[in-house]
Structures are given as structure tokens and as C-alpha cells.
Amino acid sequence: ISFSEIVIYELPENGELPNPNENSLLIDLVETHTTTYLDVEYEYYIIKINQGGSENSPNFSDKVRVSYEGVLMDDTLFDSSSIPVDFDLTSTIAGWGRVLPEYNNAENFVVNIDGTVTYNNPGIGIMFLPSGLGYFSAAAGSVPVYSNLIFKFKLYQSEFNDHDFDNVPSHLEDINEDFDLTNDDTDDDSFSNFVDSDDDND
């Protein structure tokens, strides 16, 4: 399935769904989730087009390999990559670290004779993010301030991050389990646990 095949339309004025055998109402597909970020509670929404065939899914602080398409609420495209690209989820907007762990990685992959890679049964979805889980009051490229965002994406692979190379995956250094690695400092030395290889001063 390609991103161009995932299309969101406004219902006609009569409220009737065109071609119901081919289309679905968003209300029947959307999952509502809540999270707290910077002391504010947010609702965000996801659609699971395909869960993904692997038994593994990323953690909020992992490296991920994805393709994606980001649009504003008026369907203006502001960012995309049709080929797989790698991200550290700690360096993306907060919404990605909440949403991608809800999906599984691709079941497997094949390296083709031309050197390209085909991923089979990846996680495929759509996320609807409030501005507070996006760029909020900061304009980013063509994204205006306080913009709600929509991303279509495919999740191919993920890998544990260990930012301080202490053999403890970074997601396990989130002691208070709030999806924020920067506010966990076990030994009070002003270095967050995930970048402090001796966070217990032993």
C-alpha cells in the first residue's frame, strides 16, 4: 500500500459515505490515546492500517527506520520521505515517541539484487497530533506555530538506543516512566541518567 492510496476525505453534505465497500468512516477506525507532556495532558489519535508482522515494536527512545508523509490540517504537505530513513525518537517531536511504539516492526526484509531492500508486512498507520505533541509555539520550516499535524507512516525496523554506552537501554533509564529521559538524574550530578554512564555513582 502506498501513501497515495491512504486518502482522507470530508463527508459530503448529505452525510452519506460514498462507496461504503471501499471507504470507511474515520470515527470507526480511530483510536483515542492520552498522554502527559510538559505537565499538560493531551489527546491524540491513531489509525492502525496494519499492525506489523514482527513480534517487536520500538520503545519511545529507540532508533527507528520509517517512511512517512506529514501534512497540515488543510492537507498541505510539509515533509515526507518515500524511502526508508532512520530517526532517533529522542530527537523527533514528542508525538512520534508515543505513537510508533503502538505498532510492530516489519515481519522480515529481503535485499534485492539491485541493492534495494523490500520490507514485508511493516507497521502502517496514521497519527493525528495536537500542536503540543508537535512543534507547538515554534515554527518549523513551512509548519506555522500551533499547528496540528497528520502523519502517514510505515514502520520497518527499530533498534534499542543506549545513548551513554553503559549497556542499559535508554528506555530503561526513564525511572519515572513519563517518556522524558531528561528529568531522571539518580545521582543528582546534573547529568540525566541516559547520558550518564555512572548514574548511580558506583
Protein language model annotation of sequence segments:
Residues K48-Q51, L72-F151, F165:
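A beta-strand/beta-hairpin structural motif
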